[in-house]
């Protein structure tokens, strides 16, 4: 899964570079999680997980606090999750996950992006069956066998554990991501660079330079949309 790890790192690095966008999107996600339960991460596990991910992306504390305070203050916005799937050139596939307070606006924007950027939007499930919803945990380390034993002892359903560039990279069943994190924390590991649910392509395609330029424009436009939280694809050379 080394190539998958490289793609995740590349995507994360690209998003981390656009800091204002990252902060704004995490602000929305934190607010939505706080509104759905108690605005206290100690009693709201979903909120706690989002805050941990925000810290990994180096979102400042004041951005996190502002989103929680907005939820505490009775903000009346309601956010709805969505997923849009489609195709790019030559066998390329893309999934955009959204969090929006205006579904009609989001649908219109996503359709426009696909139409203008050389893609074709598909029906629900059109490409997601070619992706696996996967827990990804990353932290500094060089002994994947030892980590695998820790997870095995904790009965975590693990797909793979690898060492990549001085990092331990763990792929779990999506339902066991939090169980895996808890097992690692119990073993004394507390600093993570990634704890995410990712849609990982079962197989990948490589595009020609011309097709890659088109597909990259599609992905960039989706990622730039304020309502889009995550974009997944199956292109190996992007």
UniProtKB/Swiss-Prot annotation:
Compartments reported by the entry: Cytoplasm
BP terms from Gene Ontology: regulation of DNA-templated transcription
Protein encoded by which gene: yeeN
One of the record's GO molecular function terms: DNA binding
Family annotation (InterPro entries): Integrase-like_N (IPR017856), TACO1_YebC-like_2nd/3rd_dom (IPR048300), TACO1_YebC_N (IPR049083), Transcrip_reg_TACO1-like (IPR002876), Transcrip_reg_TACO1-like_dom3 (IPR026564), Transcrip_reg_TACO1_YeeN (IPR026562), YebC-like (IPR029072)
Keywords: Cytoplasm, DNA-binding, Transcription, Transcription regulation
Disulfide bonds: none
A GO cellular component entry from the record: cytosol
Pfam name, any one: TACO1_YebC_N
Membership in a protein family: Belongs to the TACO1 family. YeeN subfamily.
Official protein name in the record: Probable transcriptional regulatory protein YeeN
Family matches, as HAMAP family: Transcrip_reg_TACO1, Transcrip_reg_TACO1_YeeN
Keyword Transcription regulation on entry: yes
């Amino acid at each position: 899964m080394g190539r998958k790890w490289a793609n995740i790192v590349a995507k994360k690095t690209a998003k981390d570079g656009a800091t204002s966008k990252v902060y704004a999107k995490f602000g929305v996600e934190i607010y939505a999680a706080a509104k759905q339960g108690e605005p206290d991460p100690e009693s709201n596990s979903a909120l706690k997980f989002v805050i941990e991910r925000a810290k990994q992306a180096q979102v400042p504390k004041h951005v996190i606090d502002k989103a929680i305070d907005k939820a505490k203050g009775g903000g009346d916005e309601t956010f709805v999750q969505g997923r849009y799937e489609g195709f790019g050139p030559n066998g390329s596939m893309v999934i955009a996950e959204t969090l929006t307070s205006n579904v009609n606006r989001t649908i219109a924007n996503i359709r426009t992006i696909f139409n203008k950027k050389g893609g074709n939007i598909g029906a629900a499930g059109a490409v997601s069956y070619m992706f696996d919803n996967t827990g990804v945990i990353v932290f500094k380390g060089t002994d994947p066998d030892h980590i695998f034993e820790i997870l095995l002892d904790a009965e975590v359903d693990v797909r793979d554990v690898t060492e990549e560039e001085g990092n331990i990279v763990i792929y779990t069943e999506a339902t066991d991501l939090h169980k895996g994190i808890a097992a690692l924390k119990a073993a004394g590991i507390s600093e993570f660079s990634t704890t995410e649910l990712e849609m990982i392509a079962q197989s990948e395609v490589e595009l020609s330079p011309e097709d890659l330029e088109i597909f990259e424009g599609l992905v960039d436009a989706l990622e730039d949309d304020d309502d889009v939280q995550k974009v997944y694809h199956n292109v190996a050379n992007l």
